[in-house]
Amino acid sequence: MADLSSLKDLAPASEASAPVHVRKVDTLGRSYATGKRKNAVARVWVKAGSGKIIINGRDFTTYFARPVLQMILQQPLVAAARAGQFDIIATVAGGGLSGQAGAVRHGVSKALTYFEPGLRPVLKKGGFLTRDSRVVERKKYGKAKARRSFQFSKR
């Protein structure tokens, strides 16, 4: 067993295990991240620019026609006070439009923290970096849906 004569040699756990977040940027000055929501998976590249957002080769206003989905997409940029400062290119597949918007939002949030690690506390507090793990509950046999039973008749 090791000699524990001096407790001063032991480093506090908080200092030793605190992760240091460094800037992750490729040779083209882009940060890459993946975002997921329901069955949708988004691959997102973020770079400094004029605020263009392109999803699957189309402008985000045409891809996500509903204003609610456009707002969901822009939430991390607004929360970090960086709206209009980054160009975002994303490819997203799987799921429906709502899940895809959530996946792109998750990917944009992660890519922003890689590009600018100082934004991490703001985005973390807003809940943008947490993967929303809620998925559709499976249908069970003997039931009409996941939880709904068939109509019951006493007589």
Swiss-Prot record:
Q: Name one GO molecular function term.
A: RNA binding
Question: Which Gene Ontology terms describe the biological processes this protein takes part in?
Answer: translation
- What Gene3D superfamilies does the annotation carry? 3.30.230.10
| Residues that span the membrane, as ranges | none
Superkingdom: Bacteria
Keywords associated with the record: Ribonucleoprotein, Ribosomal protein
* PANTHER family from the UniProt entry: RIBOSOMAL PROTEIN S9, SMALL RIBOSOMAL SUBUNIT PROTEIN US9M
NCBIfam families linked to this entry: PRK00132.1
Name under which the protein is recorded:
Small ribosomal subunit protein uS9
Species this chain originates from:
Agrobacterium fabrum (strain C58 / ATCC 33970) (Agrobacterium tumefaciens (strain C58))
Gene name for this UniProt entry: rpsI
